[in-house]
Amino acid sequence: MRASKYHLNTLKEAPAEAEIASHQLMTRAGMIRKLAGGIYTYMPLGLKVIRKIEGIVREEMNAAGAIELLMPVVQPAELWMESGRWEQYGAELLRIKDRHQRDFVLQPTSEEVITDIARNEIQSYRQLPLNFYHIQTKFRDERRPRFGLMRGREFTMKDAYSFDRDEAGAQRSYDIMYAAYQRIFQRLGLEFRAVAADTGSIGGSRSHEFQVIADTGEDLIVYNPESDYAANIELAEAPALLATRAAPGQDLEAVPTPGAAKCEDVAKLLDLPLARTIKSIVLAVDQPEGPAQVWLLLLRGDHELNEIKAGKLPGLAGFRFATETEILDHFGCKPGYLGPIKTARPVHVVADRTVANMADFVCGANREDYHYQGANWARDLPEPELVADLRNVVEGDPSPDGKGALSIQRGIEVGHVFFLGTKYSEALKATFLDDNGKPAVLQMGCYGIGVTRIVGAAIEQNHDARGIIWPRAIAPYEVVICPVGWGKSETVRDTALALYEALRARGVDVMLDDRDSRPGVMFAEWELIGVPLRVTVGERGLNEGVVELQARREAEAAKVPVDQALAQTLAKLDLL
């Protein structure tokens, strides 16, 4: 491609609303243009990157035995009602009506449609296993779309769905997709981790996220550098109880703590480590009849509640945070001074594993401006009703596999695999005849990759002050040839054209910048766009018999003889 015949429109400044590097750089590089909140036009450069990602995904899915189809973006509401998600999905599900006032949705996902296909297409165990996939536009009506393609409303995903006759087969399909995802992200040239994850609202019993490592990532990834253990922060298990609890060493005492409503303030006021304090979190679970059940969750002052873990405890499914009225009714005190000793009304008490092992701790006294110091289980209050893992792990916690300490880094979720079991196939009555001629329910798995999200994630991981640094596999162009003096020197033109045609003949995706721009402007623009390798052809260099190769990731350019320019360019590309 020649730049003079292409659409390049880079910007010096990013829009004020662009908060993160990928949004800023994609806009400045002319890859996307905003149409509405969370909705973007993919300009030619951006679309090239997307198509390259799709190509790698498609190749690996096909190689893994998946079969491509294409499901519609607009789906009838009846299917969503049948699965129960018409009401469950919430405001992110964009509901529309046609001219006949029939309800439809713009698909945020395709479990209902693919299960409908399966129940109509799969009759016998002889047709199994099957794995269908598509690459399609999705729409989720995010409350606050932001970060460009990282959290948009309209986006492109690859969805795959496996169907098996039994759970053992479904687990094999899961493993095949897991391995395919490993290959996909390796080929994309991204640093990533596959981490165990919560299944969330989509359901199922086994799940892994594929996270691109980036300092700006919203997710926290917990891993053990000395083993294969890796999990999302929501799922990572905190250490179990120590063998014994220390004996009480202090008397219980109510001490004044005026204005100290946070554990940090209490610890500072009493000159104690924050780890000696206990924070009280009050939850409520609404009941079919009568008032809500009130629960008191206790965590160490320096730990944070993991709401996913809490929601999985017996009796706490569907919890909400208690209202101030409920708190006053059960504790006789406003938040900030709550504790498990002498509550006004009975509450269910759940202690984190760490808290259950504490002695001589500090907790709220259920009296404004007072805390208890020297509190001890059994002596001053009953043992907790339940001891559980309630907290997020922290850096340095022992690894659950017993092989060292945990580390934490940030990541961006770009892929997710789930074993669904029969959640959707039972709801939509997707059955087949087994080898005994009896009806059986299909076992399912689903596997998603955020195609457009990968674009943003790749930039978040690969950029510098000058612009994007694309991995070769997904760069809009692999090489850009920058002739200095295109309009003045026939030798420069001929040399640049010869190299351009030679690279094209060898299948290299190359751009020739024939716009006769000033060198500084031309170089800065291609550094912003992030092409992995630049070849500079100038009259001064040609007089010396050389051209310059500049890898985007490297500080220094290399001079190579003109007659070796093709070979050296190809060799350099192989190293990128």
From Swiss-Prot:
InterPro entries: aa-tRNA-synt_IIb (IPR002314), aa-tRNA-synth_II (IPR006195), aa-tRNA-synth_II/BPL/LPL (IPR045864), Anticodon-bd (IPR004154), Anticodon-bd_dom_sf (IPR036621), Pro-tRNA-ligase_IIa (IPR002316), Pro-tRNA-synth_IIa_bac-type (IPR004500), Pro-tRNA-Synthase_IIa_type1 (IPR023717). The keyword ATP-binding applies. It is an enzyme of class 6 (ligase). It catalyses: tRNA(Pro) + L-proline + ATP = L-prolyl-tRNA(Pro) + AMP + diphosphate. It is found in: Cytoplasm. Its EC number is 6.1.1.15. NCBIfam families: PRK09194.1 (NF006625), proS_fam_II (TIGR00409). Homodimer. Consists of three domains: the N-terminal catalytic domain, the editing domain and the C-terminal anticodon-binding domain. This is Proline--tRNA ligase. It comes from Bordetella bronchiseptica (strain ATCC BAA-588 / NCTC 13252 / RB50). The gene is proS.
